[in-house]
From Swiss-Prot:
Coiled coil: none annotated. The active site is at 23 (proton acceptor), 101 (proton donor). This is 3-dehydroquinate dehydratase. NCBIfam families: aroQ, PRK05395.1-2, PRK05395.1-3, PRK05395.1-4. Keywords: Amino-acid biosynthesis, Aromatic amino acid biosynthesis, Lyase. It is an enzyme of class 4 (lyase). Pathway: Metabolic intermediate biosynthesis; chorismate biosynthesis; chorismate from D-erythrose 4-phosphate and phosphoenolpyruvate: step 3/7. Belongs to the type-II 3-dehydroquinase family. It catalyses: 3-dehydroquinate = 3-dehydroshikimate + H2O. Catalyzes a trans-dehydration via an enolate intermediate. One of its GO terms (biological process) is aromatic amino acid family biosynthetic process. GO terms for molecular function: 3-dehydroquinate dehydratase activity.
Length: 145
């Protein structure tokens, strides 16, 4: 069974509470439950990590090497737009990574329309609500074989 690490960045722990018109009403724990259920159906094992701190996210990406993680799904939150350190960590571990976003970042404020993370990833999925994570699971399943 392939191991998929799902990393969620700043403020994603507040899903279902913050800006429901943008991020929906599903809370964070329910999101993890939905992802786990679909991953099991796809014969994928998921591990979850959430942090509001850039360094902790980088450390978790590095730790993925020791755990023989096969793929990463990352929603870097606001770090999407300026964290070259997370970009570099993804490049360093060389694990297929998909960047996801609940909202369509290209239909939002100007500063949100640029990702410095996406160029380090095999792909980016944006704008499908929490289904963005499910689409990413299908994509990684295909990529990993």
């Amino acid at each position: 069974m392939k191991k998929i690490l799902v990393i969620n960045g700043p403020n994603l722990n507040l899903l279902g509470i913050r800006e429901k018109d943008i991020y929906g009403s599903t809370n964070y724990n329910k999101l993890l439950e939905i992802i786990s259920k679909k991953a099991n159906e796809l014969n994928l094992n998921t591990l979850f990590f959430q942090s509001n701190h850039e360094g902790e996210i980088i450390d978790r990406i590095h730790k993925a090497l020791d755990e023989n993680i096969d793929g990463i799904i990352i929603n870097p939150g606001a770090y999407t737009h300026y964290s070259y350190a997370i970009h570099d960590a993804i490049k360093a571990v060389n694990i297929p990574t998909i960047e996801v976003h609940i909202s369509n970042i290209y239909a939002r404020e100007e500063f949100r329309k640029r990702s410095v993370i996406a160029p380090a990833c095999v792909g980016q999925i944006s704008g499908f609500g929490i289904k963005s994570y499910i689409i990413a699971l299908y994509a990684l399943k295909e990529i990993l074989g």
